[in-house]
Swiss-Prot record:
It comes from the Bacteria. Homodimer. Transmembrane segments: none annotated. Its main location: cytoplasm. The gene is grpE. Belongs to the GrpE family. It is found in: Cytoplasm. This is Protein GrpE. NCBIfam families: PRK14143.1.
Length: 286
């Protein structure tokens, strides 16, 4: 078989190993082969960082530059002979095709980078929307919970306020009704049992009675119904509780209606005596 009929790869291989091949051509061939051997078999499946994309672009550019340099070196070294020109004529389309493939890969890589950047922006926007919606939902949940608790408190206060009227009636009946025989005593005792159960139930719900008598008058807890002049209590002291007040969880459920001490007015005789004394002192001398 003649040398011209052998495959191009075999001719190039033999020429690369021939002692007549210039040293620079053999070095370029060796570098080109090593570069291709050192290339990864495939590009990373999913580049996740800018550094990875930059590395891929750098490798592709180096391949293209290496192929162009190899082609220029071959043209310089063996292009002066007829046989070298024939080899270059067969080799140049292959190398040009490799360069075009590299350029196509560079364009594809850039397109993927743009798509990845766009997707990252969409993901960031979606994350911001999610965070905003989550915050709005949390605020809505808290507001709804507060409104629900407030409605429950209002309903509870209204119901308990109605029950306090029943408690007042039981207390008035206990003070006014005096059983005259055993039968009436049993009936009275049964009513008081109902009263006790009602009071115990109110305590379990957080209702407690105020202790107003002897305390300083406080408009936050007391409602003054009467004022009584007296010297037995300091002015502004609650001397009698007319209607019991109640608290619900340390908040006023019903104000206590009370009688408040007022300063006692001086007697008329004392006033006249004091006036005469003042007149005697102020009478001019002649």
């Amino acid at each position: 078989m003649s040398e011209d009929n052998r495959p191009l790869e075999e001719q190039l291989g033999n020429r690369a190993e021939s002692p007549n091949t210039p040293e620079s051509v053999r070095e370029d061939n060796s570098k080109s082969q090593n570069n291709h051997l050192n290339q990864p078999s495939s590009t990373p499946q999913t580049p996740e960082t800018t550094a990875d994309n930059t590395f891929v672009e750098s490798e592709l550019l180096q391949d293209s530059q290496g192929i162009e340099k190899l082609l220029a070196t071959l043209a310089e070294q063996i292009g002066s002979t007829q046989e070298g020109q024939e080899i270059l004529g067969q080799l140049q389309p292959l190398l040009t095709n490799l360069i075009q493939q590299n350029e196509s890969l560079l364009q594809t890589n850039q397109s993927l980078k743009d798509q990845l950047e766009e997707q990252n922006q969409q993901i960031d926007a979606a994350k911001r929307r999610y965070i905003g919606l989550a915050a709005e939902f949390d605020n809505f949940r808290k507001r709804t919970l507060r409104e629900k608790e407030e409605l429950e408190k209002q309903a509870k206060r209204k119901t308990l306020s109605e029950l306090l009227t029943v408690v007042d009636n039981f207390e008035r009946a206990r003070l006014q009704i005096k059983p005259s025989n055993e039968g009436e005593g049993e009936i009275h005792k049964s009513y008081q049992g109902v009263y006790k159960n009602l009071v115990d139930s109110l305590k379990r719900l957080g209702v407690s009675a105020m202790r107003a008598e002897g305390e300083p008058f406080d408009p936050m807890y007391h409602e003054a119904m009467l004022r009584e002049p007296t010297n037995d209590f300091p002015e502004g002291t609650v001397i009698e509780q007319l209607v019991r007040g109640y608290l619900l969880d340390d908040q006023v459920l019903r104000h206590a209606m009370v009688k408040v001490a007022a300063p006692k007015e001086p007697d008329s005789s004392e006033t006249e005596s004091t006036s005469e004394s003042v007149s005697d002192v102020q009478q001019p001398t002649t």
